[in-house]
Swiss-Prot record:
Residues 45-123 are annotated as: UBX-like. Residues 149-155 are annotated as: Cys-loop. It comes from Rattus norvegicus. InterPro entries: OTU1_Ubl (IPR048857), OTU_dom (IPR003323), Papain-like_cys_pep_sf (IPR038765), Ubiquitin-like_domsf (IPR029071), Znf_C2H2_type (IPR013087). Residues 258-262 are annotated as: His-loop. One of its GO terms (cellular component) is cytoplasm. The active site is at D152, C155, H262, H337. This is Ubiquitin thioesterase OTU1. Substrate binds at I261.
Length: 343
């Protein structure tokens, strides 16, 4: 997870939302908590056949299985087929104990890891998607999946909280996140003018605090700045990724998927059940963007999206016919149903 400011990650408490969000100033950069050596983030480089990559979000407490999962996602070499060499002359790491921590291996922050495929082990059969990313059998490589959050008008806020907190589903934090956004907007009326907001600054602040309003691009851009991370939203209708905070130099990125009226968080799941899902990625991890596009393309081909400008659709849960954005919004609000298909 991200290193937190006072009161929790980036000022958001892990549960309950007892007000810690509003204590952090808008745009305040949250640094690593504490500063103990055990929590210091490592920066490792990984050199493989496809080039050199930076591995981030690791520490001396990270387990070997997590390191191998990142390497697999970047290189396409399954953990069981990896050979990792370090030092000069390069020597192979002992990968037999996947629960060992990096601090107990002969590597340190700043090292270059040379990754090769072990030719003595059975190879997974690779296939290349139309986006060009290598994919192996699903049992050996981590995959990107969506996690459903409640359709309660606050799916954007719940989804953002989920990914920045490393997989914590807590819809109760939505009101506090709404108040946070209102506080940030109210603090800078010149930046957040009527021309930007579509309503006066004061009207917007009252509007966003309501629990029946939906968040969108403005709110995502504010949260990107507050959490100091790139927020990538992949659209299932256009199979396009909108990257908020892309040019801000953030080192982390999180991902959401959007179908026209509903947001869900994305996470990377690993084959090993003991390895927790990953929701926070390095901003250098372009493999995860390719995986997100593939997920969106699959949803588009199944017509799991909502054209908000012109559509006739049917609720896939109750089969009710709907026309237009307003009817879809009302139906989702009244029933909690968000799985729509175009007719």
């Amino acid at each position: 997870m991200f290193g937190g400011a006072k009161g929790g990650h980036f000022g958001v408490p892990p549960a309950g939302c007892s007000g810690a969000v509003s204590q952090a100033a808008a745009g305040t950069k949250a640094g690593p908590a504490g500063g103990r050596p055990a929590d210091t983030m490592w920066r490792l480089r990984c050199k493989a056949k496809g080039g050199t990559h930076v591995l981030q979000g690791l520490s001396n407490r990270t387990r070997l299985r997590e390191l191998q999962g990142q390497i697999a996602a970047i290189t396409g070499i399954a953990p069981g087929s990896q050979r990792i060499l370090v030092g000069y002359p390069p020597e192979c790491l002992d990968l037999s104990d996947r629960d060992i921590t990096l601090g107990d291996l002969p590597i340190q922050s700043g090292d270059m890891l040379i990754v090769e495929e072990d030719q003595t082990r059975p190879k997974a059969s690779p296939a290349f998607s139309k986006h060009g990313a290598p994919s192996y059998v699903r049992e050996t490589l981590p995959v990107l999946t969506r996690t459903a959050v409640p359709a309660d008008n606050s799916c954007l806020f719940t989804s953002v909280y989920y990914v920045v907190e490393g997989g914590v589903l807590n819809p109760a934090c939505a009101p506090e996140m709404r108040r946070l956004i209102a506080q940030i907007v109210a603090s800078d009326p010149d930046l957040y003018s009527e021309a930007i907001l579509g309503k006066t600054n004061e009207e917007y602040c009252d509007w966003i605090r309501r629990d029946d309003t939906w968040g969108g691009a403005i709110e995502i851009s504010i949260l990107s700045k507050f959490y100091q991370c790139e927020i990538c939203v992949v659209d299932t209708q256009t199979v396009r990724i909108d990257r908020f905070g892309e040019d801000a130099g953030y080192t982390k990125r999180v991902l959401l998927i959007y179908d026209g009226i509903h947001y869900d968080p994305l996470q990377r799941n690993f084959p090993d059940p003991d390895t927790p899902p990953l929701t926070i990625f390095s901003s250098n991890d372009d493999i995860v963007l390719v995986q997100a596009l593939e997920l969106a393309d699959e949803a588009r081909r199944k017509r799991q999206f909502t054209d908000v400008n012109r559509f006739t659709l049917r609720c896939m849960l109750c089969q009710k016919g709907l026309t237009g954005q307003a009817e879809a919004r009302d139906h989702a609000r009244e029933t909690g149903h968000t799985n729509f298909g175009e007719v």
